[in-house]
Each structure stands twice: as structure tokens, then as C-alpha cells.
């Protein structure tokens, strides 16, 4: 009986932490309207982190433990990881960031969202500034 009580108490505590979650989806595009076709978008605050993989058309559905399971109420920083492109030369291992660096940094991102709120959160990001090569 004691074992059953412990299991029941554990389940109650576990389910208490599972509040209502809001379904959230959207699209990530550049300022020219072209979709960002690769990367993972993160929604994070002090208590919770959720992610979604971008599809080739730039759309996403938010999940924490699995895709599309939503976000609990709160304000979140939004940033994108893995938005990189391999160099066309297969012998060159360098990669190029497809978005401006501030959108790829949890500490520098200008993007935030408050949940509950809009259930569709479309995001516009900027491309990185071209790197100026020093004169020869």
C-alpha cells in the first residue's frame, strides 16, 4: 500500500507541472520574403525551452518534448540555431551563417514572444552583412 501511495504522489506531482500549452506555428523569412530553409528555432525563458525544426518552406510547429506539443504561458526569447550553409567546395570545411548573428544568439536576439498570444508567429530575419576583405 505504501508503494502505491508513493506512485500516486509521484504521478500527481508530475502532472501538476504539465500546465496548458499553447500551440504555436509560423514561418521564418528574410526581409525579401524568401524563406529560411534550414535551422532550428528555439523559444526559451528561465523555466522552459521548446524547439522546432524549420521546413524547406520556412514553416515550423513548436514542441518541447516532441514537435507540435506547444508552449506554456510566459515570455520567451526566440533565436535560430543551425542556419548554416556548407561551402560548395567539398574540400572546404568552412560554413557560412545564413542569418545575421544576432538572430542566432540567445543572449543577443531581438526576438521575443509572449504566450498566450498570437498562435501564429511569423518571423523576419536579416541576412548577415558581407565580410569586407582587407585590400591587398
List each model region and its residues.
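Sec-dependent bacterial lipoprotein signal peptides
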Residues: 1-16
Amino acid at each position: 500500500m505504501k508503494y502505491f501511495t508513493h506512485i500516486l504522489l509521484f504521478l500527481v506531482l508530475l502532472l501538476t507541472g504539465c500546465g496548458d500549452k499553447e500551440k504555436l506555428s509560423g514561418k521564418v523569412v528574410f526581409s525579401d520574403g524568401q524563406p529560411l530553409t534550414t535551422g532550428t528555432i528555439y523559444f526559451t525563458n528561465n523555466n522552459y525551452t521548446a524547439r522546432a525544426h524549420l521546413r524547406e518552406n520556412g514553416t515550423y510547429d513548436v514542441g518541447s518534448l516532441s514537435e507540435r506539443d506547444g508552449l506554456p504561458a510566459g515570455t520567451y526569447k526566440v533565436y535560430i540555431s543551425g542556419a548554416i550553409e556548407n561551402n560548395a567546395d567539398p574540400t572546404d570545411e568552412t560554413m557560412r551563417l545564413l542569418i545575421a548573428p544576432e538572430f542566432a544568439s540567445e543572449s543577443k536576439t531581438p526576438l521575443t514572444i509572449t504566450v498566450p498570444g498570437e498562435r501564429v508567429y511569423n518571423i523576419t530575419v536579416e541576412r548577415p552583412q558581407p565580410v569586407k576583405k582587407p585590400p591587398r
